Amino acid sequence: MIRNPRFDIYRIGEKDYLLPSGQDIQSRSKVMCLGGLAIILWDKFKTDHRIVDMFRIIEEKYGAKNQDDRNIISVDVSNVCAAFIRTGALVESIESLCVEADYRGDRLLKSEDIVVYKTEDGGYVCSFPKFDSVEDLILSSEEDVGDDLDESDRFIITNKACELIRYRLSRYNLEDIAGYDYESLIATRIPFSYYSLMIGRVFIHSSSILYRDRVWLFAAPAGTGKSTHARMWEKNGSAKIINGDLNLIGRNVEGFGKGFAVSSFDHSGESLGEPWVYGTPWCGTSGIYELKDYPLGGIIILRQGYKDYIEEMSYEDGVIGILSRSVSPMWDKKLVRKNVDIITDIAKDIMICKLYCTINDSAYTLMKSYIDEYLDGK
């Protein structure tokens, strides 16, 4: 057995997590919180080992003195390895992963709507099988991204008529982007989210409301009821909906104009600016968006429930909950790392909780009281 190269360890708060790249990160069953034994085993599995070999390695490391010690180690090692296999982090061989490649590069992601390849120079190519007007989208490697996203072309879309269309990734032309045809609008979100990630911004799958001068995100998978809950706030006259499906969050760094920042951190690693929500025209099928920026108050992880109640979340669980709702690119470990770094930073300064809710107004009343208490206690 050997570890799947699409998995890696990421430090979140005081804990270590094993996370996959790609769409699997949206599934909690693919995420593992690692203890000391799991970290040791993960390190050993960087080369091919039989699980039975791990029993001996761990017995020697911990100095098993008798059969009882060996039995305990056997059970613990077996349980950790079973968890690795269950999540897909441990595989029979690298060859069994069947990584496909063509002239564009190694394939990282394949779905009905998009296929992503990694190029030899570290960039990416996105292909849209169902689109008529857009075929390939070419993204520069991170090293090619300059500091000022307003001054040069950042991505190219190739349509099937072989015409190269260059767009500027600029806050100045978001109004124009909103008028694009459907395929171009969807295609431009990919490079926009990629280069936003490079400067410390992530898209969260969520509906959002403006309440008490701050934006609050209700994050959940499609069909959970995030739009329904947001409409409760609007119906009761307490808030207005800012975006019905996708919200771009980051830190508001002064001095860079138009909301774009080179980085959310200074050279010592300290956070710069306060958490912020940036208006974009991407809003799923809701049709609701604003091209304005607001302070971010908090993120509520939404779950359907038979009764309304709020569950406090640890910092680490809050980060994992938000990370699972990120729709910014996480095609490889480098991009997962960027998502983790941004979200772990923002999560320090916002309210995070989990709301189990019904479709009744009582869910709105409960959440409003919770936010009021949070704000009044600051």
Protein language model regions, located:
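Acidic, low-complexity/disordered tracts enriched in E/D and polar residues
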Residues: M1-D43
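Glycine-rich, often acidic-flanked micro-motifs
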Residues: R3, I12, I51-V52, S206-S207, ...
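Long, charge-rich, low-complexity alpha-helical segments
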Residues: K30-E112
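Short Lys/Arg-enriched alpha/beta "domain-start" segment
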Residues: G105-L139
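Charged, amphipathic alpha-helical linker segments immediately N-terminal to NTP-binding catalytic cores
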Residues: D148-F192, I371-E373
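Pre-Walker A adenine-sensing motif
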Residues: Y194-Y211
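Conserved lysine of the Walker
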Residues: K226
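Post-Walker A alpha-helix
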Residues: H229-A230
